[in-house]
């Protein structure tokens, strides 16, 4: 949900760092930590291959345990039949085993420096286009079916957190649902181009691709 506030790249990196800190605290206090992931059907809300998602978690944070919820729109796609359900659950179990037994490489400090810079630039670009642009709300209302979706009352919670009509009050689910209806998944990529471009300018030796 935090990707709605700062963009997917910045939100993902912040979540990664937070998971690392939680793991350190749990290890220090000898607590078994189980991280909960509320995965979305859309890429903008965490959707995507389960295998790559679990294998991209910080080393040691899966540790044989995880808790995941699937969004309602993907239940039929993954669990409609016994064979589908068996395959989906098998993917989860296998991914947890692999992430536990063969965890990913711990990020080097220079990798973290790159990600910190990319996260900063991405968040700034995202905010300048969405939160700071006075014309964006009008654009959003005109190009997406959000105004009509609000009248359907199809969600389990209100569309907005308050009576305000600004972007901040809109919940993440209707935000993504509106973009998905027009096949324009802006929240999944906005700000990433600026982050990559900035990184290529800063880290030019030996190769921007190697740094990234």
Segments from the language model and where they lie:
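Short loop/turn segments at strand-loop or loop-helix junctions that form parts
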Residues: 1
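Acidic, glycine-enriched catalytic cores built around paired aspartates
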Residues: 5, 9-18, 39, 50, ...
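Alpha-helix termini
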Residues: 43, 51-54, 61, 85
């Amino acid at each position: 949900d935090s990707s709605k506030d700062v963009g997917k790249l910045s939100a993902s990196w912040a979540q990664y760092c937070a998971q690392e800190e939680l793991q350190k605290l749990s290890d220090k206090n000898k607590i078994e930590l189980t991280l909960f992931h509320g995965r979305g059907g859309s890429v903008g809300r965490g959707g995507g291959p389960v295998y790559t998602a679990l294998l991209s978690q910080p080393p040691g944070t899966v540790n044989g345990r995880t808790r995941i919820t699937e969004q309602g729109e993907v239940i039929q796609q993954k669990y409609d039949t016994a064979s589908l359900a068996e395959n989906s659950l098998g993917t989860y179990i296998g991914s947890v085993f692999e992430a536990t037994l063969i965890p990913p490489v711990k990020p080097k400090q220079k990798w973290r420096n790159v990600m910190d810079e990319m996260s900063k630039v991405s968040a700034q670009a995202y905010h300048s286009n969405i939160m700071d642009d006075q014309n964006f709300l009008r654009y959003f209302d005109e190009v997406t079916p959000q105004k009509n979706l609000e009248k359907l009352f199809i969600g389990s919670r209100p569309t907005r957190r308050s009576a305000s009509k600004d972007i901040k009050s809109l919940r993440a689910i209707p935000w993504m649902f509106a973009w998905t209806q027009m096949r324009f998944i802006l929240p999944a990529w906005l700000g990433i181009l600026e982050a990559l471009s900035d990184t290529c300018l800063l880290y030019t030796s030996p190769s921007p691709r190697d740094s990234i």
